[in-house]
A protein has these predicted regions:
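A short, aromatic-enriched beta-strand patch in the conserved N-lobe beta-sheet
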Residues: 77-79
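AlphaC helix of the eukaryotic protein kinase fold
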Residues: 42-66
Length: 222
């Protein structure tokens, strides 16, 4: 069985520009966790540099480790694998809103519609999480369905803080790094990603709620 540090890998859950997320097991206590491992793509590593990417990754882990809020995913361990690549450990949650609504990679395809009452409850949870983040001067900058995990009890938890900006902190990623996801990102964030405030996250939430209610993205023809 493949291992990352002391953790037994069960399977890979997904992969992004900076790395991969795995479902893993703590063998001593038979507990399932999620592991995010820094595995940047060649293009991103060339553009940004491995040292800078490791700094961003550590910044994400430290930010998540400081959370104590029911609607945010918390990091609770950090280490390096046998190749020296950094990883951090989080609670494992098997579902996300992207899977729930059936959002495809191309985004243009209509998604499943969720009942308005449930969307209202989801919206409250997301906004409570953002209220906590913004109170601590943290701007997520990548709110989208795939970054909202859904527990078996229907509790939402925001994850993936690799693009987060902490206002007043000198380091929050390089200026030349593209931040956010198509359709969910406000225009000002695409132009000046280091200058946005909490309103950028609220824009993304509005798009997300619209998507769940209508199955469409703003500007898409029905």
């Amino acid at each position: 069985m493949q291992r990352i540090g002391k953790y037994d890998i069960i399977r890979r859950l997904g992969r992004g520009g900076m790395g991969a997320v795995y479902k893993a097991l703590v063998p001593e206590i038979d507990k399932v966790v999620a592991i995010k491992l820094l595995q940047p793509g060649e293009l991103l590593e060339t553009m940004v540099g491995l040292e800078q990417l490791e700094a961003i990754f550590l910044f994400e882990a430290r930010t998540m480790a400081a959370f104590n809020q029911p609607f945010l995913v918390t990091a609770h361990d950090f280490d390096r694998d046998h190749q020296g690549r950094p990883f951090f450990v989080m609670e494992y949650i098997c579902n996300n809103l992207g899977e729930m609504i059936g959002e495809t990679f191309t985004l243009e395809e209509p998604s499943r519609i969720i009942a308005a009452e449930k969307v209202l409850g989801y919206g409250r949870q997301i906004l409570r999480a953002l209220d906590f983040l913004h109170h601590h001067r943290i701007i997520h900058r990548d709110i989208k369905p795939q970054n909202i995990l859904v527990t078996d009890e229907d509790t939402l938890k925001i994850c993936d803080f690799g693009m987060a900006l902490v206002q007043g902190v000198s380091f929050s990623g390089p200026d030349n790094m593209q931040v956010g996801s198509p359709y969910y990102t406000p225009p000002e964030q695409r132009k000046q990603p280091q200058s946005v405030d909490g309103r950028a996250d609220l824009y993304s939430v509005a798009v997300l709620l619209y998507r769940m209610l209508t199955g469409q993205l703003p500007g898409m023809q029905s």
